[in-house]
């Protein structure tokens, strides 16, 4: 007998997670497993698709076990995933032809420059809502076709399949019966027309990608099929798909135009719901599909920062300044301010609203009085400064001041960060008590599809406990700090440009 539980698979950049939710949106169990980050060259980031699959299926089974549930009890599986990351596999063997090229990967920066120089940027933005950048999937697929032996010939014979991580997981869950994605993930590929909600033939010709490689595009909330594997999840309906940031927007109940959220993950991602209108940007954000439920497509403005919480990983694993995230928090709180130090974590370039793929990281303002605490504090504050830059750009595009910013993600547990975020923006920051909003958003989408909830309005009215951080800093002090941040930003731009 199916019970009112949703199993959400949350496949992220550094770990695979599975969360069981009940009908009230309460977490009943969580399982998580990190997987290998592969760095073959400077600026290259890869994952092993088979390891992604193995880690995801293992945590799914573990989460059910912890909740004392069997597959027959689960109403539906929901899938949310790191977006833009490109997987290409052989339909006949089911094996990837190359590692997944991760959204952070910059190997195609030169190719993207060629597209811009040839005058394609306006056309691409009009069709996709995106800027030409190696961040998005299209150029990654082109690289695989051009650089993996026999890949192009196999693709032209219809042997190869491309998908974002959701497509790969669903292919594996259904033993190759379904090759699908949803509109939110498709809109991140640089191959998808967000106005017609179809793959764009002119874009495919521009990037020389055969249409036969592409998954079928479906809505974000429907029963797509059932699990076909015998790994403990058999026969569960697969009923909701959304890219991680769109899922987070839905999980934060930002279901009305004008509402916005920011996720502090490996990167930072701010989205604002713009309703059924795809709002064009003049401030180097991107226009993206938020979700499709039934026949209604909703859109969002988005700004993406490449390095957010990952700056803490760098201090831990790269500089070895701390041994754990808890130790980082203590170090950052050991000083009252940044001591004039600014960290710009442009390790893989700068995302929105700057879009400088040749920027590189820097630390500025160091004196003999600088301590490790100041560096840690500056690293923490760098996350907030980047988010403030996104907020400014978003408000310029919409012309509407944001009344509050809803937040989630791992670093949202850091109250020092959230208070500084409110201070530097001059806007209240609101954190829900349950920060699993990405998985929750996907669970809501799946639950609507199988009838646990009737529509988004019901979900928007569900009670949410939250903590609110009001701005305390004076505007003059905030402006002075922002000025120094902007000065540091200007130093790192174009660092590696030829």
UniProtKB/Swiss-Prot annotation:
The keyword rRNA processing does not apply. ADP binds at residues 13, 17, 266, 309, 410, 414. The keyword Lipid biosynthesis does not apply. GO terms for biological process: glycerol catabolic process; glycerol metabolic process; glycerol-3-phosphate metabolic process. ATP binds at residues 13-15, 266, 309, 313, 410. InterPro entries: ATPase_NBD, Carb_kinase_FGGY, Carb_kinase_FGGY_CS, FGGY_C, FGGY_N, Glycerol_kin. PROSITE patterns: FGGY_KINASES_1, FGGY_KINASES_2. One of its GO terms (cellular component) is cytosol. It catalyses: glycerol + ATP = sn-glycerol 3-phosphate + ADP + H(+). Pathway: Polyol metabolism; glycerol degradation via glycerol kinase pathway; sn-glycerol 3-phosphate from glycerol: step 1/1. This is Glycerol kinase. It comes from Koribacter versatilis (strain Ellin345). The gene is glpK.
């Amino acid at each position: 007998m199916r019970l009112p539980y949703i199993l959400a698979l949350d496949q992220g950049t550094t770990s695979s997670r599975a969360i069981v939710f009940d009908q009230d949106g309460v977490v009943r169990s969580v399982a998580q497993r990190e997987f290998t980050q592969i760095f073959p060259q400077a600026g290259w980031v890869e994952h092993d698709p088979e390891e992604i699959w193995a880690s995801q299926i293992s945590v799914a089974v573990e989460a059910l076990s912890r909740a004392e549930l069997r597959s027959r009890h689960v109403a539906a599986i929901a899938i949310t995933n790191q977006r833009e990351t490109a997987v290409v596999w052989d339909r006949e063997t089911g094996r990837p032809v190359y590692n997944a090229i991760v959204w952070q990967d910059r190997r195609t920066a030169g190719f993207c420059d060629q597209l811009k120089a040839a005058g394609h940027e306006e056309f691409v933005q009009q069709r996709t809502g995106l800027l030409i950048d190696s961040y998005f999937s299209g150029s990654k697929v082109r690289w695989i076709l051009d650089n993996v032996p026999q890949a192009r010939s196999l693709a032209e014979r219809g042997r190869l399949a491309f998908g974002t991580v959701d497509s790969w997981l669903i292919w594996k869950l259904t033993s190759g019966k379904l090759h699908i994605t949803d509109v939110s993930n498709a809109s991140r590929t640089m191959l998808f027309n967000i106005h017609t909600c179809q793959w764009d033939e002119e874009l495919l010709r521009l990037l020389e990608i055969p249409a036969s490689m592409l998954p079928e595009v479906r809505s974000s909330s429907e029963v797509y099929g059932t699990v076909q594997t015998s790994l403990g999840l058999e026969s569960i309906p697969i009923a909701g798909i959304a890219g991680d940031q769109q899922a987070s927007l839905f999980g934060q109940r930002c279901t009305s135009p004008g509402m916005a959220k920011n996720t502090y993950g490996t990167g930072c991602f701010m989205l604002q719901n713009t309703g059924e209108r795809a709002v064009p940007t003049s401030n180097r954000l991107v226009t993206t599909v938020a979700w499709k439920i039934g026949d209604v497509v909703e859109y969002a403005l988005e700004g993406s920062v490449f390095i957010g919480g990952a700056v803490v990983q760098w201090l831990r694993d790269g500089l070895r300044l701390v041994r754990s995230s808890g130790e980082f928090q203590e170090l950052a709180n050991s000083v009252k301010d940044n001591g004039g130090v600014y960290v710009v974590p442009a390790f893989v370039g700068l995302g929105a609203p700057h879009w400088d793929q040749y920027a590189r990281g820097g630390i500025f303002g160091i004196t003999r009085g600088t301590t490790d605490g100041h560096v840690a504090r500056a690293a923490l504050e760098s996350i907030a400064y980047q988010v403030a830059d996104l907020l400014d750009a978003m408000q310029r595009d919409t012309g509407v001041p944001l009344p509050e910013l809803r937040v989630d993600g791992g670093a949202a547990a850091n109250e020092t960060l959230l208070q500084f975020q409110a201070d530097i923006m001059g806007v209240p920051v609101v954190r829900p008590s349950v920060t699993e909003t990405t998985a929750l958003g996907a669970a809501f989408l799946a639950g609507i599809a199988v009838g646990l909830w009737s529509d988004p309005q019901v979900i928007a009215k569900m009670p949410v406990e939250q903590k609110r951080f009001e701005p305390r800093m004076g505007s003059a002090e905030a402006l002075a700090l922002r000025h120094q941040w902007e000065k540091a930003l200007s130093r790192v731009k174009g660092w590696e440009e030829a």
